[in-house]
Amino acid sequence: MRSKNISEVKKKIVVVDFGSQVTKLIARRIRELKIYCEVVNLKDFDKINDFSQIKGIILSGGPSTVTKKSYPKIRSDIFKKSIPILGICYGLQLITKFFGGKIKKTKKKREFGEATLIEKSNSVLFKNCYNQKRSKVWMSHQDAVFKLPKNFINIASTNNSKFTAIQHKTKKIYGIQFHPEVTHTEKGKEILNNFVSKICKIKKNWLLSLEKNRIIEDLKDKIKNKKVICALSGGVDSSVVAVLINNAIKKNL
């Protein structure tokens, strides 16, 4: 129930959803940093023409593999823009593939669980995250980068993945194989904060309380004096919708 007119004029981070089970966690972590963030599916992202208010793009993880002939791709024009980009898991592999690097299946069928991250280069993405050069991160992947793309450098490794984190030499394009959005990754939220605040340079512009008030006013404007029927399952989503509509139109619900 969001007004597109309002969201389009707000500076934001956009998360492109490639099907990861934890994609929405990325947006949640960024909103916890008081920065406005939207999750957009691939088809809707392809339709975006105006990027003026998009200050950063995050490519989520997902179940697909770039090693097949057909796989979900990201529109190529975003790499020609000056908008910072962070690829997470599958997002890293998309970036690597696009710029000419090589992706292969890992020796293990799938790497899932805790891994020790070893920093290889001082990167703003990891700034002030770790007192030591080693830290715990959470992996969930079956493909890995085996050859860096041209003009990229390696900024972190694990025992099972040489190129766990990479960045472009001149552009603000980053990729990480692990998941900073989950609590299992040490300083994961700080990594996301470095991306949105230090790299994207977006200022805090979102509060949950203000968002609630905005949605209620938006509902009032759209519904006016009409009657509304709300189907309530008892789950979180429908319950929140029911409360918001009730706050907006009272007896007309």
Q: Which residues fall in each region the model found?
A:
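Short alpha-beta junction capping motif
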Residues: 77-91
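RNA-binding accessory domains that recognize and position tRNA/RNA substrates
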Residues: 1-59, 63-69, 79-81, 97-253
